[in-house]
């Protein structure tokens, strides 16, 4: 019994060595991030992407984290998205890119897995692959992604339902701060919003990325929008 405190301390130390927490945003400026300067800034202690009807992006562009690629990880952050009127009634779409690659560096365009969110009632929480295979899991679905003859059109096997889409939507606060969590371990991907699991995916395809960059999306749209991010915490295995 006398050895138990030592064993417990050893286990705690081992766990600490295995996992590393890293704050990705200092709350003050864009240090560690790069994007099209005219669209990104820090406002009210948050990374802020903004377009207006008179000043739009020509295609989806991203604020890209500059400290290398990430493989297995847990990422949590808070986000807020509003339409051109500062509400959540018209257009507003964004997402968190992970295990992605830069495909157009001059305009900070990436492709890859995306944890989607929006002002609307449908897409927040889904798994989307930007400039790739499109929607891989709708909100509330457990999915296994299988190979097919066309790598861009994989076979999506829905193996279960986590929750109804409308019940997940009811937990999202419009035009306010929400918490997003992404867990990626091997080919197993999970998204959470405000503690609610929204998708659970196993990607068994060869093209499923195992590592890549992190980035935040500013979406092209018919009208302006503002998206903000803060409290960005990355946990990885050392």
Residue ranges and their predicted role:
Residues 5-14:
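Bacterial N-terminal signal peptides
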Residues 19-238:
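Carbohydrate-interacting regions of secretory-pathway proteins
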């Amino acid at each position: 019994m006398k050895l138990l405190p030592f064993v417990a301390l050893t286990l705690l130390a081992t766990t600490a060595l295995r996992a590393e927490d890293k704050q990705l945003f200092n709350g003050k400026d864009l240090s560690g991030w790069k994007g099209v300067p005219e669209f990104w800034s820090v406002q009210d202690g948050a990374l802020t992407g903004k377009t207006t009807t008179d000043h739009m992006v020509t295609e989806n562009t991203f604020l890209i984290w500059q400290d290398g690629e990430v493989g297995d990880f847990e990422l949590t952050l808070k986000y807020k998205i509003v339409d051109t009127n500062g509400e959540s009634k018209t257009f507003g779409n964004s997402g968190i890119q992970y295990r992605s690659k830069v495909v157009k560096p001059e305009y900070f365009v990436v492709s890859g897995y995306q944890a989607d969110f929006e002002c609307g009632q449908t897409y927040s929480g889904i798994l989307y692959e930007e400039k790739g295979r499109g929607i891989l899991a709708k909100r509330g679905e457990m999915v296994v992604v299988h190979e097919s003859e066309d790598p861009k059109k994989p076979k999506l096997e829905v193996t279960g339902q986590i929750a109804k889409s409308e019940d997940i939507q009811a937990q999202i606060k419009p035009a306010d701060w929400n918490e997003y969590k992404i867990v990626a371990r091997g080919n197993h991907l999970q998204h959470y919003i405000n503690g609610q699991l929204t998708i659970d995916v196993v990607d068994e395809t060869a093209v499923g990325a195992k590592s890549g960059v992190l980035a935040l999306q500013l979406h092209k749209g018919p009208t302006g929008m503002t998206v903000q991010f803060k409290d960005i915490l990355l946990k990885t295995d050392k």
